[in-house]
Amino acid sequence: MAKSHLLQWLLLLPTLCCPGAAITSASSLECAQGPQFWCQSLEHAVQCRALGHCLQEVWGHAGANDLCQECEDIVHLLTKMTKEDAFQEAIRKFLEQECDILPLKLLVPRCRQVLDVYLPLVIDYFQSQINPKAICNHVGLCPRGQAKPEQNPGMPDAVPNPLLDKLVLPVLPGALLARPGPHTQDFSEQQLPIPLPFCWLCRTLIKRVQAVIPKGVLAVAVSQVCHVVPLVVGGICQCLAERYTVLLLDALLGRVVPQLVCGLVLRCSTEDAMGPALPAVEPLIEEWPLQDTECHFCKSVINQAWNTSEQAMPQAMHQACLRFWLDRQKCEQFVEQHMPQLLALVPRSQDAHITCQALGVCEAPASPLQCFQTPHL
């Protein structure tokens, strides 16, 4: 497993059990420096017996940028998961089943052929080019422009910010550059009566994968590594892991993966790769479970308010409640209760789900600092 600041908490076990066993330990002189030294790292806090102070007085008031490293570590962990044979085989079998149920049976063998040719390339390119720093920049957990010490200053991010608007990635492998374009001309039209809509096919398959990936289950799986960490540290680790993982999966699956796969591999345009959601694939908001009602309200209200002026936002938010026949009153109450926060968040928002996470009404609050601020700490 890759070295991880999040996972280094496991290395604190010898320190917690018997301080003399630690490879490096803080001296009494260093600990005498006070909070400035204690709270530089979790290791220092434990060695100086100041963990409670740092949790309550320093880390609990830290900015999201202080957690940048943990964010990057979880991206590394998720990327590592894609290298597992079982994971790749599960994705392949699922996509093969999706090919088999295509309504036009003439597309089935071609769909299978696309999987055979492109899936290994996509997985390999994803593993080698995804940049944790760029991903964490995208979700707002790392300051932009901050390079890792081992990163060459001239090296571009693998997933830079312009990816939000158009596909901009490093030089492609020759195998990918040699592949056909959106209509895959090497699959001759003479073999089929119609041109093959491979960008549509790509977009459909990607969204099908997104719909079935259990993000909550993955988040809990990532957090399992925290269970061997004792006492309060384990609770913080698990909380951070679960919240970060869902946030990162939202960012990766929602924007990065569709553009990476369909834009790079099939050279679909940005519009093709990120086109309108397919009704048969994208889950409808009305199908969400009852426990997500407030999250449902929030996303609908934000989507309604996006295309209005700041002056018209309150009215637009109330109008969004008209679609909820049975829960209109609850929706109105939600809008009234959260109106000040919504008016502040919506103008700066690019993603309704992330914004509602920041508001605390959708799963995985956008600020993992809540892990530090919970009452039991």
Curated annotation (Swiss-Prot):
GO CC annotations, alphabetized: collagen-containing extracellular matrix; cytoplasm; extracellular region; lysosome; membrane
Main location: secreted
Residues covered by the Saposin A-type domain: 24-64
Disulfide linkage: 68-142, 71-136, 99-111, 199-268, 202-262, 226-237, 295-362, 298-356, 321-331
Signal sequence, start to end: 1-22
Keywords, sorted A to Z: Disulfide bond, Gaseous exchange, Glycoprotein, Repeat, Secreted, Signal, Surface film
Propeptide: 23-191, 271-377
Every Saposin B-type domain range: 64-146, 195-272, 291-366
InterPro entries: SAP_A, SapB_1, SapB_2, Saposin, Saposin-like, SaposinB_dom, Sphingo_Act-Surfact_Prot
Pfam families hit by this protein: SapA, SapB_1, SapB_2
Residues carrying covalently attached carbohydrate according to the record: 307
Protein localization: Secreted, Extracellular space, Surface film
GO process terms (BP): respiratory gaseous exchange by respiratory system; sphingolipid metabolic process
Subunit structure: Homodimer; disulfide-linked.
Other noteworthy facts: Pulmonary surfactant consists of 90% lipid and 10% protein. There are 4 surfactant-associated proteins: 2 collagenous, carbohydrate-binding glycoproteins (SP-A and SP-D) and 2 small hydrophobic proteins (SP-B and SP-C).
Function: Pulmonary surfactant-associated proteins promote alveolar stability by lowering the surface tension at the air-liquid interface in the peripheral air spaces. SP-B increases the collapse pressure of palmitic acid to nearly 70 millinewtons per meter.
Protein name: Pulmonary surfactant-associated protein B
Organism in which the protein naturally occurs: Mus musculus
Gene, per the UniProt record: Sftpb
